[in-house]
Amino acid sequence: MALSPEPSSRFLVPATMGSAMPELPGAPNASLNSSLASPTEPNSLEDLVATGTIGVVLSAMGVVGMAGNVYTLTVMCRFLHTSASMYVYVINLALADLLYLLSIPFIVATYVTKRWHFGDVGCRVLFSLDFLTMHASIFTLTLMSRERYAAVVRPLDTVQRSKGYRKVLALGTWLLALLLALPMMLAIRLVRRGHKSLCLPAWGQRTHRAYLTLLFGTSIVGPGVVIGLLYVRLARAYWLSQRSSFTQTRRLPNPRVLYLILGIVLLFWACFLPFWLWQLLAQYRGAPPLAPRSARIVNYLTTCLTYGNSCVNPFLYTLLTKNYRDYRQRSLHSRGTSGPVGVRSFPQGHTRCQLGSGRSVTSSSQQATETIALSQAVPGSLCV
């Protein structure tokens, strides 16, 4: 999140390649410290151009991203009365993006003035905010992928889950993200180094390296493995449904919804993986053999990529929810009129599924449209 001439984008890193002061690797925003020790003269033309360019780019991203996420939150709040999980999760994602983008003015102000103006509290809040929002986003995306998977292979379980259950899960993502960000919030502190103020963690470099490695696992590796497995199994379910000779019509979820969720996940990885590799390279291999100017450019690019993710996401959220609403409306319409082969229509507002064991489940149409009656995935079930 912060800017630095060293190989660090948002985390505190050991000062290298011309930095005037030693710094521990640290938290999101940490490169704000390094920006106070630019490898170019503070008033040089190169420094002014770099400062102006990055300030304009980040400010533009902030304005576009904040407007988009506020719009998304406004629209999604209108649908909170429904039982659809998608709306709860999109609100979670937009809120995380908005909180992350709100840090841009602090970064730009610090980089332009070469001074830290926000005290010890500012250090603790801004340096831990990245970890919090990063994890809240990827945990929510993992929940969304799990929900879509369950809608295909366990549709009746999905029907029976209430809106309150999904809100608890959404809240749980924030609590878990806060737990992971808490060590940085407690360890970071404002330190005077000569005439400058720096935000530095109180622990040593080994501890910090272990902490960053843990966060890389919880924000990239772990969720990546889970989401990858879910989509492999979803692809297998689709493949089996296409090859099946079963004559009863099966209602599969809108592939566009699944593709858009996967697209949001891939965008997250594309924007954050370079940043993480840049950080971990500095932790485990030391300063890369780059000139100060080159390291500064890489730092700018990785920083802009992470903010670019939150800037572009609202457009994907809009497409996602539009396709999801269209799918729900088509599902409700088809069930209320003719109904698919082998499925008997019921009065508007209810569907009834009979299990092979003789048990039955009745649910509201709002919840029913959330699920997929995939006979191949749920042996022994038949919608009547």
From Swiss-Prot:
GO biological process: blood vessel diameter maintenance; neuropeptide signaling pathway; regulation of blood pressure
Region forming the signal peptide: none
Glycosylation-annotated residues: N29, N33
PANTHER family, per the entry: G-PROTEIN COUPLED RECEPTOR, UROTENSIN-2 RECEPTOR
Source organism (scientific name): Bos taurus (Bovine)
Annotated localization: Cell membrane
Record's keyword terms, sorted: Cell membrane, Disulfide bond, G-protein coupled receptor, Glycoprotein, Membrane, Receptor, Transducer, Transmembrane, Transmembrane helix
GO annotations of cellular component type: plasma membrane
Disulfide bonds: C123-C199
Function comment: High affinity receptor for urotensin-2 and urotensin-2B. The activity of this receptor is mediated by a G-protein that activate a phosphatidylinositol-calcium second messenger system.
Cytoplasmic side: 78-87, 147-167, 233-259, 321-384
Annotated CDD domains: 7tmA_UII-R
Gene of this entry: UTS2R
Tissue: Expressed in neural tissue, including sensory epithelia.
Extracellular topology ranges: 1-54, 114-124, 187-209, 286-299
GO molecular function: urotensin II receptor activity
Membrane topology recorded in Swiss-Prot or TrEMBL: Multi-pass membrane protein
Keyword Protein biosynthesis: no
Family affiliation: Belongs to the G-protein coupled receptor 1 family.
Name by which UniProt lists this protein: Urotensin-2 receptor
TM region(s), chain numbering: 55-77, 88-113, 125-146, 168-186, 210-232, 260-285, 300-320
